[in-house]
From Swiss-Prot:
This is Patatin-like phospholipase domain-containing protein 7. CDD domains: CAP_ED (cd00038), Pat_PNPLA6_PNPLA7 (cd07225). Residues 1-36 are lumenal. It comes from Mus musculus. The keyword Phosphoprotein applies. Disulfide bonds: none annotated. Residues 394-406, 1323-1334 have a biased composition (Polar residues). A nucleoside 3',5'-cyclic phosphate 2 binds at residues 499-585.
Amino acid sequence: MQNEEDACLEAGYCLGTTLSSWRLHFMEEQSQSTMLMGIGIGALLTLAFVGITFFFVYRRVRRLRRAEPTPQYRFRKRDKVMFYGRKIMRKVTTLPHTLVGNTSAPRQRVRKRTKVLSLAKRILRFKKEYPTLQPKEPPPSLLEADLTEFDVKNSHLPSEVLYMLKNVRVLGHFEKPLFLELCKHMVFVQLQEGEHVFQPGEPDISIYVVQDGRLEVCIQDADGTEVVVKEVLPGDSVHSLLSILDVITGHTAPYKTVSARAAVSSTVLWLPAAAFQGVFEKYPETLVRVVQIIMVRLQRVTFLALHNYLGLTTELFNPESQAIPLLSVASVAGRAKRQMSYGPEEQLERSLRPSEFSSSDHGSSCVTVSGPLLKRSCSVPLPSNHGEVDELRQSQGSGSNTSAFQESHEGATSDLGMAYNRARILPHSDEQLGNSLASKSKKSVVAETPSAIFHYSENFRDETGACGKTDAIFRAATKDLLTLMKLDDPSLLDGRVAFLHVPAGTLVSKQGDQDVNILFVVSGMLHVYQQKIDSLEDTCLFLTHPGEMVGQLAVLTGEPLMFTIRANRDCSFLSISKAHFYEIMRKRPDVVLGVAHTVVKRMSSFVRQIDFALDWMEVEAGRAIYRQGDKSDCTYIVLSGRLRSVIRKDDGKKRLAGEYGRGDLVGVVETLTHQARATTVHAVRDSELAKLPAGALTSIKRRYPQVVTRLIHLLGEKILGSLQQGSATGHQLGFNTASSKWDLGNPPGNLSTVAALPASEDVPLTAFALELQHALSAIGPVLLLTSDNIKQRLGSAALDSIHEYRLSSWLGQQEDIHRIVLYQADGTLTPWTQRCIRQADCILIVGLGEQEPAVGELEQMLESTAVRAQKQLILLHKEDGPVPSRTVEWLNMRSWCSGHLHLCCPRRVFSKRSLPKLVEMYTRVFQRPPDRHSDFSRLARMLTGNAIALVLGGGGARGCAQVGILRALAECGVPVDIIGGTSIGAFMGALFAEERSYSQTRIRAKQWAEGMTSMMKTILDLTYPITSMFSGTGFNSSISNIFKDRQIEDLWLPYFAITTDITASAMRVHTDGSLWRYVRASMSLSGYMPPLCDPKDGHLLMDGGYINNLPADVARSMGAKVVIAIDVGSRDETDLTNYGDALSGWWLLWKRWNPLATKVKVLNMAEIQTRLAYVCCVRQLEMVKNSDYCEYLRPPIDSYRTLDFGKFDEICEVGYQHGRTVFDIWVRSGVLEKMLQDQQGTSKRKDCGVFTCPNSSFTDLAEIVSRIEPAKVAAVDDESDYQTEYEEELPAIPKETYADFQSTGIELDSDSEYEPSMLQGPPSLTSPEQSQDSFPWLPNQDDQGPRLEHPS
């Protein structure tokens, strides 16, 4: 049995072995056969390849051996169709321009050919290539200053004559005989190094002009050390206008602390100030103008620099009493004549109490005596609940609406006329002045009515009744006033002096008042206060005692009152109005000497010292103030005109760094840090500057250390302003503006003058100017000037070259009065058109958008001449006309234009009305307030720097909330002047910029959002994910179907889109080019859409949200005052799990799959990459949210995802409700009103201009500024602790009233009278009779003010 089993096992083993060997053998054979088969197939393929190659080579050789026959060309059918199609299009395109006649047959043929043209385009499918904006360098005149400075060698006049002419020009324009008279007194003085020109103790009676060499002006400190405050170079002078005034008035004084010496061997021209006395004797009317200019310089230059910028107040005035003894008043009051300046105060107060005039306890009025003129009146005070009555103005009258003063001697008082213009009054006859006294009754700031009002008359001698005693005191006080004013004719004050008694607490005049009076205190005191800089607190400057004047500086200069006058105790004083004083001055010009001398005596010795250091410069257009790399030795203040700052880069290219307007501080950073000039600054147009040397600034810091705080404040504003400027921030982030025409730096702002020029004869320039004036009137006082009203006001010869100075001076005065002056040029190159261009800060080239973009004659003249003012292209469109198009062609033909705007004009602008009908129509238009949403209001806000920008952020479907916010903006009356955005914000912003209405924007946005929810389109757009998941074809078509072929330049609103340039690693701001392409590029998320190739330079553009998701800083750089930023981006989770130093993916997997484990918040790789991509964006967003110009809004849309486009209506409603709530709060709290107010009119101008020294830090600046020596503590006035707080109610002016649209918006001071008068039309368009009331402060054509006539 065992053997059988073994045999079976052995047999089985043998069988297995046999089968295994068979299997191995089979596999070997199979592999061999497979190998052989492979070798065979390979051999066959090789043979086939060799055979095919041999065949083609053989055929090619045979072809080469054969003689090639002449080819027979033929047109393919599609080529024939293309040829005839192009031929048809050429014919159809030219035919409409050659058709003549208005018959129906030609019109039908035109329509047929148009249909054929469109059909041919569809069949042939031509790809239309739209023109692109050509990048051009700015014109040389824009960024380059004139190379020729004040050239003495090439002049035909001697150098001494040129230098003297340059320096006496500060006193006004002297005619040739007057200047030659002055030149007779010039003396040459040779000085050696170290030799003194003058020293303390010598009489201060001369003007010194350096012809060769250099002088040093020194001020002696209290410890005897001399400080150099000014270096005088050839062409400059050493003088004090206050000292010249002392010589003219006969009160010469010696130098006390000021000296001058020659730093090197020098030649000096010496002109004694007494030479002016001889000129004034021959030309008495010149005296008024020279004194007025000296007073204007004192107020506008000295006080502007020392008070507004350095914060000095009490240091500028002499608190000591300058009163004269009231001898006549003392004799009448029954007291002995005393030598003290403030006279018999108690006796006068008892004699002038209101009870003296009352006949009963109920306050019945005294008998009023009146003759042919109202010579005297007296009254009792009314109860306080009867309201406030302006007794000052009621007693004196303003006379602004009476007829002009007629005088027979033409041309004899031209300087007096200019003085009248600067003082902003209209001359009157004596009778008109007297009659106006009883007719004027106004609301004022005076708390109570005066106890007595008397008008002086030497012919009236009635001392009976209750008013007799006061009448005697009044006449006695008037005699003392005659003594102070140095008048010997009492009749000059006849009917021109008012005697007032005010109780304690009366506010007599307020700081900033325009219509002021000269007050002569008889009893009591008037306290003079001034508001501190950047504070509401008042400080007491000085007290006006009996025998002293106050208010005379503002009357002489015509400038606003620079302090507040208040009676803290019962006070009696004489009052002379501005109009009355100028009537006295017309008869006796030398009256200004006595009045001006009282102003000079009130100035402190410190002001006298600084007057030697301060200079008043006149700079012609194109002249460089300083150049980049020059030594910083002074600071400039712009008084009038405009300056431009240009920086030269290392590669030699120039960039516009900024512009400076009226009141701006220039070069202060380099001066304080003692660094070289960082930029070149030149004059855009003729400008006036105040020059403050660095030495004078150092001397002021030594004497008054509190100035250091003010300087640090100014520097802080400069630095913070530069950081908040969009251009600066953009350059730090790689701001790439290659797509813009050229880098403008800061857009035009702080403009004082704007000129409008027509691009063709068909432009309705008159209607355009009136519409723009109407829109500007909502911002501030505006004046429209044309050649017609200039000739009507100033005479037919006003534009002649002989009267250039007088015209320039008058135009400068209008700039002082108005917020902005609008110049309407003529249709051709006339002298007035040249004057408009010369005076303009910005030039508007007005064209018709429907016309061909041809260059007009005036534009060609602008290109040929070096006009430095920036030019803006304004294209007018009809309301029912086609949308803007072909803007690129307009801009490419005008390289001198730095920007453009499209205006949709009302029908009245294009109406074919005659001039009288046009005037009549606009008279009615000006009775209504302008529409803040109109395009003209948008232009007005952009010209004045008050534009409101709307910035829309990116966030996918959450951006649908922005449509709801647009609805809320429209309902709450918030205008939008500039719009832009990123990603979905760029899309929504483009829709609104194209439509300008919420309803159309919502319809088109919803249409696009519905297309984004299509699953089929999404699937069809999928591609192999090498660059992105989608090809972008479907997304491109969805956007291009919305915007078609629109260009960014053709949008109604200024628009910009933000993209990320991954080729240059920079941010791109797109303001021109194909609209749909740049919107698509701004919406290209990485991984989903491929980058868009920029059609201009081929750079790859991605979603702008990676670098700036809420570009409020870009909108700020485009000129917006306020930026409303709507943030709809997703918020990142910040509460993440702290997992330690290492992280295991298995641990995270366990935490995720285990339902019982605690959930952890750890970012995955995709989230980490996304956050890295948005790091720069988050940083930029925080900067924007913390800026003071940005109003940040974020609707509650966190619950919606990025691709929830199907919830469009729901998200839109969320945005609307949030926006309506926020904007309603703005309306109630006054935020919206503040947005719409002029930034220069609501608050003091802050110097947040261009940061001209970018290489310094704030710490260094503060350290350098604080480097001063100890100084004495300034004496504090004992009266400074008086109560200074007061409340005042300004008169309410009805909005529906409208006085005049040619001088719209004149500021109505708290003490001014508002009497609306309806005119028939603007002075530029009406006869002189119709236009008389539109310039109430200017004399009539027949007046003897600024009227200019030919010498013949």
